[in-house]
Amino acid sequence: MAKQSMIARDVKRAKLADKFYAKREELKKIISDANSSDEHRWAAVLKLQTLPRDSSPSRQRNRCRQTGRPHGVLRKFGLSRIKVREAAMRGEIPGLKKASW
């Protein structure tokens, strides 16, 4: 089980990313727009830098929903490989079975 503080930190980052999503996208659009003036683009870059670091979606970590484990997480299930295996062995995931060939 991951430390509760690490899980809480990721939850906080997700909330910040949602809060600043629109503003961040607007600034990125200005920066990537070739028609805008250099001063306008530079002002957008500086404004983007003033936003909180944790508001960037790339700072979030995929974590297992049950254990909070940060590595070996399968996106399709939102669980770590260990928990997916346990659930599959108990037959809790429909259509998923152990491979045999």
UniProtKB/Swiss-Prot annotation:
Family of the protein in this entry: Belongs to the universal ribosomal protein uS14 family.
Pfam families linked: Ribosomal_S14 (PF00253)
NCBIfam families in alphabetical order: PRK08881.1 (NF006477)
Protein name: Small ribosomal subunit protein uS14
Gene Ontology annotations of biological process type: translation
Function: Binds 16S rRNA, required for the assembly of 30S particles and may also be responsible for determining the conformation of the 16S rRNA at the A site.
Keyword annotations: Ribonucleoprotein, Ribosomal protein, RNA-binding, rRNA-binding
One GO CC term, this protein: small ribosomal subunit
Top-level taxon of the source organism: Bacteria
Gene it is expressed from: rpsN
InterPro entries per UniProt: Ribosomal_uS14, Ribosomal_uS14_bac/plastid, Ribosomal_uS14_CS
Quaternary structure and interacting proteins, as annotated: Part of the 30S ribosomal subunit. Contacts proteins S3 and S10.
Sample GO molecular function, one term: rRNA binding
The species this protein was found in: Actinobacillus pleuropneumoniae serotype 3 (strain JL03)
Cysteine pairs bridged by disulfides in the record: none
The UniProt record lists the keyword Repressor: no
Record flagged with keyword Oxidoreductase: no
